[in-house]
UniProtKB/Swiss-Prot annotation:
Protein residues bound to Mg(2+): 488, 494
Keywords carried by this UniProt record: Cytoplasm, Magnesium, Metal-binding, Nucleotidyltransferase, RNA-binding, Transferase
GO annotation terms (biological process): mRNA catabolic process; RNA processing
NCBIfam families membership: polynuc_phos, PRK11824.1
Protein name: Polyribonucleotide nucleotidyltransferase
Length: 723
């Protein structure tokens, strides 16, 4: 496969081409994807030998190159650094549909790297990278049960659209990414504007039709350039040892799993495992370490199989709940006295404390990635400390999981956030997971709803989230509501659904089997709605509406509208004027290009003072108006009076009084307050004032009046002609 080969098709009205054989030829498989003007190279490499251990070491990287959009990276080094949140989320998005399609027991390391070379804003590099990852794997010698494909789906005026453009996405009420094989769906990620379960299911199935077409397209590529798959040594337990361990643990594991409380159950299961491991240690076998590792793996599989059998056949969950039963709920608001809003949400042994912070709009987050520069005024961050599951270990920066869960919560709550005009604040939510036994991301959504209501944020409606699970044995399946950690770990699906009472706002699905049918998806969505409404009822019983007043410690923001041409007057030369206002009042000021002014401070009196100053600066003088101002400067020809902040006018000496004034100081002194009338604003904007126009003209007594000389008008005479 040394010569370049190109395969083309149409994708959402744009040309899609896959080029193989020219680039990255030393990788196990590589493909250059051209979608419109978007270009992404994906390379897949698989190690020849398996790694020790009982896990599959798959790594997916998505690398954004700033040159792809004609930008130079910021910062001192001027080169790409750690992945952006968007790149991290994209890597997770690609990993999730690919991982289930490697064989059970696959232990060879696989690394997939997608590098973005060029970006057309209307042709998603994320979807190109997902397709490229599948192509790179299916044409390589790495055993992989693909192909897969992914598409974005939108809905505009009730009509579904594949890979919507930026303009279309802004009008869409669904933002869905769906991935899968020709036969089934195995990954869903969605945000929505309170859409129904039926509409979301139709969007998923609409996307799957396009996925089928892309999988057929990849089959053509496989037939032309696909390599023969290599033989891989899969991790398989020794049948005799497996039977021996099963016999030793029979009955004991079942009883341990049925222990309802999490910590007690974990201890009981650990006791069973430890007892059996100790029995093998006592045998003093030659290859003891290898045998003990295999026994531990077999015990893990026995635990998994027994939990799945209890749920599927006996309909018994580890904690004794029914399959559609929600764990006990409790919640509280206002726990933290100095924060702007807080909410504690507990569901069984999962607990999240969410905190809401309000800030001026200037504290938004600037997003400068491969798209156009934008800013976010709403953020949700998720933290998962190890003490939440009773473990120790180093505390590191947020990883892929924490970034992903934070983004899911943000997507779920985004639709209910009030507009900038309604609520001119930057809103940051932080969810601290204090206990975890499954569904912590959904607990963070519930806690965040409580925190915003406690902070007085006028959200459109409360949002709740629930995680659904699945245990599928052959054709028999059981859907679980509100899964706990063990059911998530050993189950076949983690299906998170968040929304209001009127519809879905976010959806995320990961599965460990090949895919799901429409029937299972439909039932899971219906069961999730029942659980969501139950949780919403609990949340609104704790706090039913936003608090009428913001916290005393939250900034109070007042909005003022001025003419855009007056912005320069408020800012002043070099920012002198606006900085003077900030220094005098201690407020924070943001001015938009349309003339909207946001003034923020915890002290309302200072807010009002700043508004008064700005109103003075932008006030326009009108002829005939009367003002009271201070004398700021005196010259021989008159006095300059400050009418209001930033606006002076001249009272000419002849306009000080009706009688003749010898010196200005005879009437006015520096700092005097004087009432004046505007008599003229000239073409240069200079203001002329009069004091005497407001004074009554004094009448002289009859005896004091001097007789006026009679005015005589003389006729004009001709000058004598010169001779």
């Amino acid at each position: 496969m040394s010569e370049k080969q190109v395969f083309s098709t149409e994708w959402a009205g744009k040309t899609l081409s896959v080029e193989v054989g020219q680039l990255a030829k030393q990788a196990s498989g590589a493909a250059l994807i051209r979608y419109g003007d978007t270009v992404v190279l994906t390379a897949a490499v698989g190690s020849k030998k398996p790694r020790p251990g009982d896990f599959f070491p798959l790594t997916v990287n998505y690398e954004e190159k700033m040159y792809s959009v004609g930008k130079v990276p910021g910062g001192f080094l001027k080169r790409e650094g750690r992945p952006s949140d968007r790149a991290t989320l994209t890597a997770r998005l690609i990993d999730r549909p690919i991982r289930p399609l490697f064989a059970e027991g696959f232990r060879n390391e696989v690394q997939i790297t997608s590098t973005v070379f060029s970006v057309d804003q209307d042709c998603s590099p994320e979807m190109a990278a997902m397709l490229g990852s599948s192509v790179a794997l299916v044409i390589s010698d790495i055993p992989f049960e693909g192909p897969i494909a992914g598409v974005d789906v939108g809905r505009i005026d009730g009509k579904y659209v594949i890979n919507p453009t930026i303009e279309q996405a802004e009008k869409s009420d669904i933002s869905l990414t769906v991935a899968g094989t020709y036969d089934a769906i195995n990954m869903v990620e969605a945000g929505a504007k309170e859409v129904s379960e039926e509409a979301m299911l139709e969007a998923i199935m609409f996307g799957h039709e396009e996925i089928k077409r892309l999988c057929e397209f990849q089959q053509q590529i496989i037939a032309a350039v696909g390599k023969e798959k290599r033989e891989i040594e899969l991790f398989v337990s020794d049948p005799e040892l497996e039977a021996e361990v099963k016999a030793a643990s029979e009955g004991k594991m079942k009883a341990a799993i049925k222990t309802e409380e999490k910590k007690a159950r974990e201890a009981a299961i650990e006791d069973v495992k430890e007892e059996i491991l100790e029995s093998y240690k006592a045998k003093e076998l030659e290859n003891e370490a290898e045998i003990l590792s295999e026994v531990a793996h077999i015990l893990e599989m026995i635990e998994k199989d027994e939990m799945r059998r209890l749920i599927s056949q006996d309909k018994i969950r580890p904690d004794g709940r029914k399959v559609n039963e929600i764990r006990p709920l409790s919640s509280e608001v206002g726990m933290l006295p100095r924060v702007h809003g807080s909410g504690l949400f507990t569901r069984g042994q999962t607990q999240a404390l969410s905190v809401c912070t309000l800030a001026p709009l200037r504290e938004h987050q600037i997003i400068d990635g491969l798209g156009t520069e934008e800013y976010k005024r709403f953020m949700h961050h998720y933290n998962f400390p190890q003490f939440s599951v009773g473990e120790t270990g180093p505390r590191r920066a947020p990883g892929r999981r924490e970034i992903g869960h934070g983004a899911l919560g943000e997507r779920a709550l985004q639709y209910v956030i009030p507009s900038e005009e309604e609520f001119p604040y930057t809103i940051r939510l932080v969810s601290e997971v204090l206990e975890s036994n499954g569904s912590s991301s959904q607990a963070s959504i519930c806690g965040s709803t409580l925190a915003m209501l406690d902070a007085g944020v006028p959200i459109k409606a409360p949002v709740a989230g629930i995680a659904m699970g699945l245990v599928k044995l052959g054709d028999d399946y059981t859907i679980l509501s509100d899964i706990q950690g063990m059911e998530d770990h050993f189950g076949d699906m983690d299906f998170k659904v968040a929304g209001t009472k009127d519809g879905i706002t976010a959806l995320q699905m990961d599965i460990k089997i090949d895919g799901l049918s429409r029937q299972i998806l439909d039932e899971a969505l219906t069961q999730a709605k029942e659980g969501r409404l139950h949780i919403l009822e609990h949340l609104t019983s704790t706090i039913s509406a936003p608090r009428e007043e913001l916290s005393a410690y939250a900034p109070k923001i007042i909005t003022l509208n001025i003419k855009p041409e007056k912005i320069k007057d408020v800012i002043g030369p070099g920012g002198k004027q606006i900085n003077a206002i900030i220094d005098e009042t201690g407020v924070k000021i943001d001015i938009e290009q349309d003339g909207t002014v946001y003034i923020a401070s915890q002290d309302q009196a200072m807010n009002r003072k700043a508004i008064a100053i700005i109103e003075d600066i932008v006030r326009e003088v009108e002829v005939g108006e009367v003002y009271t101002g201070k004398v700021r400067r005196i010259e021989k020809f008159g006095a300059f009076v400050e009418l209001f902040k930033g606006t002076d006018g001249l009272v000419h000496i002849s306009e000080l009084a009706h009688e003749r004034v010898g010196k200005v100081e005879d009437i006015l002194k520096l700092g005097d307050e004087v009432t004046v009338k505007v008599i003229e604003v000239d073409q240069q904007g200079r203001v002329n004032l009069s004091r005497k126009a407001l004074l009554e003209k004094k009448e002289q007594p009859e005896g004091d009046k001097k007789p006026q000389a009679e005015k005589k008008f003389y006729p004009k005479t001709k000058k004598p002609e010169s001779k």
